[in-house]
Amino acid sequence: MIASIIISLTGCSNTKSSSTTDATADTSGPVPRVAFSGDSAYSYVEAQCSFGPRVPNTEAHRRCGDYLLAQLRRHSSAVTEQCVDLRAYDGTTLKARNFVAEFYPDKPKRILLLAHWDCRPWADSDANASKHRQPVMGANDGASGVGVALEVARLLAANEPTVGVDILLTDAEDWGDREGDSEDSWALGTRYWASNPHREGYVYPTSGILLDMVGDANAQFLKEYFSYRSDAKTVSTLWALAAQLGHGDRFVNDYGGAITDDHVEIIAAGIPCIDIIDQRKDSPTGFCPQWHTTDDVMRHISPSTLAAVGETLTAYIFGMK
C-alpha cells in the first residue's frame, strides 16, 4: 500500500459517501465480549514469519499458503482457494492464491473481513540502500492482519453471530510500483476477487473491513480517508467501540491520510469498506518506521495491540443486528 497526503475531514460531512451498511453494531448498550486472544493471534503471526518472507513465486509463499489454507479449513467447512496468474506492473507473472472462508453462509446479511498475506519483494524504504533489493519479512505488513483474521475465524467457529462473515486472505497486494504513477499496481489479488467470485452463485457481502499493519507495539489507528468517505458509520462505530473497550489510545479519534490499499478495490466494486491501518502523522512515509524495511520483524509485534484490534472487531461483529 502507499499513503497520500494527510487530509483533514474534521467537520466535512459532505465528503462522505451515502453508502452505508445494512447491518450495524449497537453501541448504546453493553459491549459484546468474545474471548479474543492476543497471544493466539501473535502465534499465527509468528507461524507465518517462520516460513520466511512470503513473496509470490517463492517456496516460502507456497508453504505459508498451504498453512493458511489448512488453518481456515480447521474452522470452516466452506473454504475456497482461488488460484490465478496475475501480471505485475514490471511484467512478472505472479502465481497468486486467494483464500476465502465463509462462516454461516445461509445468513442473508454478511460482512467481509480481509487481510493480505503476501510480502513485498523489496525493502525499498530501508535506511540502508544496500538492502533495498532484499525481501520484507512482513510481520506487521501482512502477517499481523492475517493473524487477527485467523483468531476471529477460530471464534466464529465456536460462536454464532447474527450476521454471516466471509474472511478473505488476499494475495499480491504488495508488488506495487512506488516510483511510478501507477496506483493500480497494488492489491492485485483483491481486484481480481472483487470482479471474479471464488465460486458460482456467490453473493458478495454488503460491507467490508480490511486489517493491515495491526500489530506494532506503538500502533496508531487513524480514520483513513477512503474508509470514512465510503462508510463513515462503520468507522465511527468501530472507533466508539474501541474507546468503550479501553483502546482509545490506539484507535485515535483523528483523521489520517488516503491510503491505496485493498479496501479501495472493494469500494470500487460497489461495496463499502474500511481500512484499520496503522498511520503516523509524524512519519515521512505516513506509516510506522519498519514499513517496507528489513526491520518489519516479530520483535515489533505486540500481543496487546493485536488484542485491541481483535476485541474491537469481535465486539462489532457480535454486536451487529
Regions found by a protein language model. Give the residues of each.
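C-terminal motif of bacterial Sec signal peptides marking the signal peptidase cleavage site
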Residues: 8-11
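N-terminal capping segment at the start of a domain
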Residues: 17-64, 75, 284-300
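Second-shell loop/turn segments in exported
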Residues: 27-35, 50-59, 86-89, 131-143, ...
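Extracytoplasmic/secreted proteins, especially bacterial periplasmic and envelope-associated proteins
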Residues: 40-50, 63, 67-74, 144-151, ...
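A non-catalytic alpha/beta surface segment that caps or lines the substrate-entry region
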Residues: 43-106
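Solvent-exposed loop/turn segments at secondary-structure junctions
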Residues: 54-56, 85-88, 106-107, 117-121, ...
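Active-site-adjacent substrate-binding region
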Residues: 93, 207, 214-321
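Acidic/histidine-rich catalytic neighborhood of metal-dependent amide-processing enzymes
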Residues: 133-233, 258
